[in-house]
Amino acid sequence: MAKYTKEIPAVKEKTFTAVTTEVKEGYEVLQFKDQGTPMPYIFRDNDEMVITFVGSSFEGEYPIIEEGLFTGLEINNRSGNMELRIPVDINDTWGYLVDLSDNTIKIRIKNSVKEVESFYQPLSGLTVVLDAGHGGKDPGSLNPKGGTTEAQLNLEFSSFVEDRLVALGAKVVNTRTDDTFVSLWDRVSIFNDNNGDYFVSVHHNASVNTGVNGVEMYYAQDADKKLAESLSKDMSDVTNRKNRGPYQWRQYVLRSSLGPSVLIEAGFVSEDKEFIDLQDETKQILSAGTVADNIAKDLVRRVQVAK
């Protein structure tokens, strides 16, 4: 088992004296109720999560946790830092979130999502957050000759993705449904606040080289590479656009560790022929189908790995 050995600098100490646990539907929460939001350093391997809060200590009554994801929790004070060791099997969880809002520490760990035994609605019980990029004061990428903006295309494409996801049984939460500006912070917050299972950000690309074309997918977490890879190939196949492959990129909206995230670049608005093709409703519907279908395939793959 890997060990957490990174040297962490100590800062002015915050002392915590109370800790509670709470079981919610689909996840559990560990909360330190005293004032303070110290910087967390997180390390995780297959059977343990280690969270170190810089410049903090725990001086309260040691919690007795007899069941749930936090069973076996260890709290240690080391070199001016508070260290939590949570012996949780990665296969028993879907994702996690360390929330430092409201001057408290809340650690949320999601239970592993279960595969649904339904041929027609394999995504029943799943929450997918759809993020139509840009909007409002931010039109996104533009074709040099004008016309439909990327923000408009993102919204149109997202609506088709939503239709297909709902047909497969998923609950869909949109970061925007009209031409309004939504900050990157708020987009991620919508995912976290709704305890999302998947996050899909929809975009269309552009380049100063107007001859560049094709589909691209972006992911941040290593575990999401297969989803991005498969989706890039399938969208390329149904649209006959070049498959430019998946790229790893720690873009802000992809950084949440609560669940799988992928950012779609469906094509290049800067290339004239592809710009026209991106506005074709049939191609939009076909592309949307690959998004929903790949989420369904990815869910099955992750559940099988966890067994």
Identify the role of each PLM range:
Residues 150-153, 157, 161, 184-187, ...:
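Stable alpha-helical elements in mature extracytoplasmic
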Residues 197:
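Conserved acidic residues
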Residues 201-208, 218-219, 247-307:
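Active-site-adjacent mobile loop/cap segments within catalytic or ligand-binding domains
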